[in-house]
Amino acid sequence: MTLPRPVAAVVFDMDGLLFDTEKLYGQAILTAAGELGVEMTTEVFLRFIGTPWAHNRRQMLEAYGEAYPAEELRVAWMRHFKLLVVDNLDLKPGVEALLDLLDELGLPCAIATSSSHSTVEHHLGEHGLADRFHHVVAAGDYANSKPAPDPFLVAAQKLGVDPRDCLALEDSLNGVRSASSAGMMIVMVPDLIQPPDEIRSLCATVASSLLDVPALITSSRRGSAAASS
């Protein structure tokens, strides 16, 4: 596994990449649907990963009809999610070691997410990570959500780094599409969805966890140093 260029900055997705929250969203929406007595399946939920509410609402109406109580479900869904997060907000393996490496190498990093700033602040605060990221790009900071390139382009702009020299770390299909459209190098770390060939072709590599990423970064920089010496 190698990266095509030396890494100058890293842009992280959040849900399913930094935090093991996608499974909590899945549990919460099924519980909420049961509470309201409406249909919802894991198959339909998986279409929501890495996408904003407007997209999710459309998916619900397409799957279950225009009379589906999407807004009511959203309220119950978020209520159950917040209850689950209280005792189950787990970091993904390798997060802290990777952030330590970036500090050691002096590489800036940012988060690019479809979640709200308040959600990001809560999750980072729960694990003492609020000061580990130079910038947070969240809902409201860009015109178009993933799979459009906007979140990653805004992150690169805030970091002051050419997008081509940024490494994007993503777990979702739309996240990979977004980072690819922004011109970034991509390592996908799949969570609930395995990448089809179309998505694999957009990635420098697909890793089993964030534990694999430090070696990729150090190797890319070592190769650059050797080439310039």
Model-identified regions with their sequence ranges:
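Short glycine-rich loop/turn motifs that provide flexible caps or phosphate-binding loops at active sites
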Residues: 15, 49, 93, 109, ...
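Conserved G/P- and acidic residue-centered "switch" motifs that form tight phosphate/ATP-binding loops
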Residues: 13, 17, 113, 171
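Asp-based, Mg2+/Mn2+-dependent phosphohydrolase catalytic module
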Residues: 1-8, 100-103, 116-229
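Structural motif
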Residues: 48, 112-114, 169
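N-terminal helical cap/lid subdomain that shapes the substrate entry/recognition surface
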Residues: 3-105
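Conserved SAM-binding loop
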Residues: 18, 91, 109, 144, ...
